[in-house]
UniProtKB/Swiss-Prot annotation:
Domain of life: Eukaryota
Species for this entry: Heterodontus francisci
Main location: nucleus
Record key words, sorted: Developmental protein, DNA-binding, Homeobox, Nucleus, Transcription, Transcription regulation
Gene this chain is encoded by: HOXA9
DNA-binding region (UniProt annotation): 193-252
Segments crossing the lipid bilayer: none
Protein name: Homeobox protein Hox-A9
A molecular-function term among this protein's GO annotations: RNA polymerase II cis-regulatory region sequence-specific DNA binding
Location relative to the cell: Nucleus
Example of a GO biological process term: anterior/posterior pattern specification
SMART domains membership: HOX
Biased composition (Polar residues): 160-170
Length: 260
């Protein structure tokens, strides 16, 4: 216990003494008091001769001078001083507004640049919503008309594609309606699957009738000549003569025996 108490007291005393010495040195550091104390010590001890110390050369030949801030006029034009930026304020709706979107003042003054030249920046209002923008209303209307409007060629192309799509949908609907397992649906939506007959004109029919009355059977050479004159194929001429002969046989069967 005694040893620890002695060490603690010594530690406290050393701290107190150092603090007192610092206070005294800071409080009585003036040159007049130091000279007075030195003269009193010399008078009290006359036996000792005063010591004269030779002055040593200073390490630095020139005296230190405080560094002065350079004026803005001497700075080059490329130098731009640091400008403090205002803190970003929160928007009313809780979002942060970016600083580079804020409108800049009309003229900017820089200390390093001559004041005679002004860099004008046109302020542009930043609209938060599209409904708030009133300055660009005419441009927006023009753009909307341009984007919404279509050229006549585009309209024709769209109409043609629309009609083709309608035709495809109708054909698909017909295919859906014609179900082989549902005969009633087939009967209601049935279409003629027979190939269309070749339409003969009145002039062609008249010439074929004349040729049939003259000769019911045609040779191959005569068939070729008739087809070339009437602008038909040999197959068409052959089929027409076959049908005409069948029709004539049917008429002959239906006649009574007395009329034969």
């Amino acid at each position: 216990m005694s040893t620890s108490g002695t060490i603690s007291n010594y530690y406290v005393d050393s701290l107190i003494m150092h603090e007192n010495e610092d206070l005294l040195s800071s409080r009585y550091a003036s040159g007049s008091l130091a000279q007075a104390s030195r003269q009193a010590a010399l008078t009290e001890h006359p036996d000792f001769s005063p010591c004269n110390f030779q002055s040593k050369a200073t390490v630095f030949s020139t005296s230190w001078s405080p560094v002065h801030a350079q004026s803005s006029a001497n700075m080059p034009t490329v130098y731009h001083p640091y400008m403090h930026q205002a803190p970003i304020a929160a928007a009313p709706d809780g979002r942060y507004m970016r600083s580079w979107l804020d409108p800049m003042p009309g003229t900017l003054s820089f200390p390093g640049l001559p004041s005679s030249r002004h860099y004008g920046i046109k302020p542009e209002p930043v609209a938060s919503r599209r409904s708030d923008c009133t300055t660009f209303e005419t441009h927006t209307l023009a753009l909307s008309e341009y984007t919404c409007g279509t050229s006549p060629a585009d309209k024709r192309v769209s109409e043609v594609s629309f009609s083709e799509n309608n035709g495809e949908t109708e054909s698909n609907a017909d295919k859906l309606h014609m179900d082989p397992n549902n005969p009633s649906a087939n009967w209601l939506h049935a279409r003629s699957t027979r190939k269309k007959r070749c339409p003969y004109t009145k002039h062609q029919t008249l010439e074929l009738e004349k040729e049939f009355l003259f000769n019911m059977y045609l040779t191959r050479d005569r068939r070729y000549e008739v087809a070339r004159v009437l602008n038909l194929t040999e197959r068409q001429v052959k089929i027409w003569f076959q049908n005409r002969r069948m029709k004539m046989k049917k008429i002959n069967k239906e006649r009574p025996k007395d009329d034969r």
